[in-house]
């Protein structure tokens, strides 16, 4: 009987890398996690209603069906369910989640276990926090190593239980954002209380009081966003989360700082649109004059 192997990855980009690394055959499959795990709501259970709520919280309205398929897949038919991961929150949480969805056939490949790859990544990384993850590695670099032979590890019973317990903790913890700031498996939770504390630290500083009111909100938003984000691909999400918390904070809204910020944004958008129209008219005039 042929052994069936399933590779579980965090994104389509990682899927492309893994596809080139394995000797793909009809007995090997690759599945991509259909949701983001580093921000938003994690499913507390696997009912259709709960998974739809998870998709809605992430504004991924079309992924509730794929979430249901992912969580209700029969993982027991595979001899090995292999999770490819590094040390960022997204990939660590995927490993924990798979421990909840599997029994005794879970395996892992941690790219940080390869000392050469790990040290080179830390030396050359341009990320805000140099936390290694699979998608950050180029296929040419990955192809130099025998990942399935040298770095594949079976998750033992005790470790499996710990991973499953970790997933239980995180899916019941309310947090806007989950990030790793080092390669030590420690996941930091970002909630409203933490963002408000960061806001107060900035507002209590001397330089903040010297700023004109019309730039204060922009300064708060940019500093908090920078302190939250781990890598450039997450910057927009961090900005949205910080903006959501600040806009609902009475200290900010009662001072009119949000209104001032929005007025400036609207004016800049209006000016940008007018500039666009002006440039289009310029191009038309040039073509007319050339005739």
PLM features: what roles do these ranges have?
Residues 230-245:
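Short amphipathic alpha-helical interaction segments
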Residues 22-25, 75-76, 96-105:
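Short, surface-exposed basic-aromatic patches at helix termini and helix-loop junctions that form
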Residues 209-227:
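Short acidic, hydrophobic short linear motifs in intrinsically disordered regions
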Residues 246-291:
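C-terminal engagement modules used by replication, chromatin/transcription, nuclear envelope/ESCRT
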């Amino acid at each position: 009987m042929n052994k069936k192997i399933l590779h579980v990855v965090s994104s389509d980009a990682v899927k492309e890398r893994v596809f080139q690394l394995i000797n793909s055959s009809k007995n090997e499959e690759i599945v991509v996690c259909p949701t983001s795990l580093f921000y938003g709501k994690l499913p507390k259970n696997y009912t259709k209603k709960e998974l739809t709520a998870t998709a809605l919280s992430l504004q991924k309205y079309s992924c509730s069906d794929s979430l249901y398929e992912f969580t209700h897949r029969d993982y027991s038919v595979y001899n090995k369910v292999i999770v490819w991961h590094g040390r960022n929150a997204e990939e660590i949480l995927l490993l924990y989640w798979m421990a909840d969805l599997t029994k005794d056939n879970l395996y892992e490949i941690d790219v940080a276990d390869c000392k050469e790859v790990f040290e080179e990544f830390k030396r050359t990384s341009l990320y805000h926090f140099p936390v290694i993850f699979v998608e950050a590695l180029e296929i040419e670099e990955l192809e130099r190593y025998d990942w399935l032979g040298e770095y594949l590890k079976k998750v033992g019973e005790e470790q499996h239980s710990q991973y499953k317990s970790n997933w239980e903790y995180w899916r019941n913890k309310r947090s806007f954002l989950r990030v790793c700031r080092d390669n030590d498996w420690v996941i930091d939770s970002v909630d409203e209380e933490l963002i408000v504390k960061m806001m107060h630290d900035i507002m209590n500083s001397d330089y903040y009081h010297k700023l004109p009111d019309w730039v204060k909100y922009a300064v708060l938003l940019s500093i908090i966003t920078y302190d939250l984000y781990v890598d450039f691909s997450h910057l927009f999400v961090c900005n949205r989360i910080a903006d959501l918390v600040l806009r609902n904070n009475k200290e900010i809204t009662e001072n009119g700082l949000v209104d001032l910020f929005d007025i400036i944004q609207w004016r800049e958008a209006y000016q940008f649109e007018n500039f666009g129209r002006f440039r289009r008219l310029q191009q038309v005039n040039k073509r007319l004059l050339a005739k």
